Amino acid sequence: MLGFLSARQAGLEDPLRLRRAESTRRVLGLELNKDRDVERIHCSGVNTLDIEPVEGRYMLSGGSDGVIVLYDLENSSRQPYYTCKAVCSVGRSHPDVHKYSVETVQWYPHDTGMFTSSSFDKTLKVWDTNTLQIADVFNFEETVYSHHMSPVATKHCLVAVGTRGPKVQLCDLKSGSCSHILQGHRQEILAVSWSPRYEYILATASADSRAKLWDVRRASGCLITLDQHNGKKSQAAESANTAHNGKVNGLCFTSDGLHLLTVGTDNRMRLWNSSNGENTLVNYGKVYNDSRKGLKFTVSSGCSSEFVFVPYGSTIAVYTIYSGEQITMLKGHYKSVDCCVFQSNFQELYSGSRDCNILAWVPSLCESVPDDDDETSTRSQLNPAFEDAWSSSDEEG
C-alpha cells in the first residue's frame, strides 16, 4: 500500500491502478464478518438480494415466505459490533404482500424511491419505497422466475420478465402494459439480464439448455444463440446450439458488459464474448448447481482481475473470471445458498440462504500483501489475481 501511495504521489503510477490493486486485495481477503449481523426477518429461505446503486447503502431481500425486507447497511452506531437493521418490510400482514415466494427484487437503477419485485404468484409489482404502496402491478398467466431493469437505459423503461412459459415478456413502466414479446425459447425462462453496456441488449437463459442474446429493437428474433461448441460439432442444426447440457438457470454480465457468464445444471459455468457469442473456453471446473429455479450470482467491479461469486451448495465459490482459478470457498451458511450480491464501494458481499439468514462477508484487515516495487514479482506469485488485467481501451470502449 505504501509503495503504491508513494508512486501515485510522485506521478509514477496511474491512481486507478492503486484503487484497483486495493480493491483486489480486499476481495481476496473476504471473510465472514463476526462483528456485523443482518437482522433476521425471513421465516423461510432468502431467494434474492439487491443493493441500490445510488449510495450502496440500502439492500432489499425477498423470501420464500413472500416477504420483502429493506435493510440499512450503514453503521450509524459507530460501534465495532452492530446489526444491519430492517428499515421496513412488506410482511404477511401487508395488504399487498406477494402470496407466494418472491423470486427477484430490484431497485430502480436511478433512484431509491422505487423498487420492483416478482413472485410465483404470477405478478410483477412496482413499489413506492417511501410509502411501501404499490404503484403498478403486471399480471401474467405463468409463474414468474426472474425480471430485470436495464442499469443504463435512458431511452426506454422496459422490464424484462422470464416466466414458466417460453416467451420473454417486456413490460413498459411508462405505459403500464406489456409492450412486446420475445419468442425463440422452447421451455421456461429461468433468468434474464440486460447488458450494463448497451441499453437494448438483453440476455436470457432457459430450461431448454439455451442462452440467447437479443436486441429488443429487432422484430426478427434473437441476435445470437450461444453455442458451447462454437459451431464446430454441427454446422446446421439449430438443436445443436446449446449453451449447457442441462438447464441454463443463471446469467450475469461482467461489469464492463464485454462478457457474459452462464451457469447450468450440468455443473458448469461458461464465459462468453457478448459481442459475437463465442465461448471463451475458460475452465472453472465443477460448479455445483442443483437449483430447480434461477440461481443468482454476481461479479466484482473495479478490481485488477475481476471475480465471480457463485452459490455452491451451502458455500460461495469465488473464481477469477478470465483465468477460471478458484480463489476460495466462503463457508458460513448451514443450508444451500440461493443468491449473493456484491457491494462495490467497500468490496463487501452479502449472501442469502435457505437457512433464512443473510450473511455479510467483508475484507479481512489482518493480513497485508507486500506492495514494494521490488516485490512486485512476489506479489504476482502469491496470487495471479493481483496481475493487472486492465487496459485503457476497456474504459474507453
Swiss-Prot record:
The protein, known as: DNA excision repair protein ERCC-8
Any GO BP annotation: single strand break repair
UniProt entry tagged with the keyword Transit peptide: no
Quaternary structure, from the entry: Part of the CSA complex (also named DCX(ERCC8) complex), a DCX E3 ubiquitin-protein ligase complex containing ERCC8, RBX1, DDB1 and CUL4A; the CSA complex interacts with RNA polymerase II; upon UV irradiation it interacts with the COP9 signalosome and preferentially with the hyperphosphorylated form of RNA polymerase II. Interacts with ERCC6/CSB (via CIM motif); promoting recruitment to lesion-stalled RNA polymerase II (Pol II). Interacts with KIAA1530/UVSSA. Interacts with a subunit of RNA polymerase II TFIIH.
InterPro entries given in the database record: G-protein_beta_WD-40_rep, Rad28/ERCC8/Ckn1/ATCSA-1, WD40/YVTN_repeat-like_dom_sf, WD40_repeat_CS, WD40_repeat_dom_sf, WD40_rpt
Taxonomic classification: Eukaryota, Metazoa, Chordata, Craniata, Vertebrata
Role this protein plays: Substrate-recognition component of the CSA complex, a DCX (DDB1-CUL4-X-box) E3 ubiquitin-protein ligase complex, involved in transcription-coupled nucleotide excision repair (TC-NER), a process during which RNA polymerase II-blocking lesions are rapidly removed from the transcribed strand of active genes. Following recruitment to lesion-stalled RNA polymerase II (Pol II), the CSA complex mediates ubiquitination of Pol II subunit POLR2A/RPB1 at 'Lys-1268', a critical TC-NER checkpoint, governing RNA Pol II stability and initiating DNA damage excision by TFIIH recruitment.
Predominant location: nucleus
PANTHER family, per the entry: DNA EXCISION REPAIR PROTEIN ERCC-8
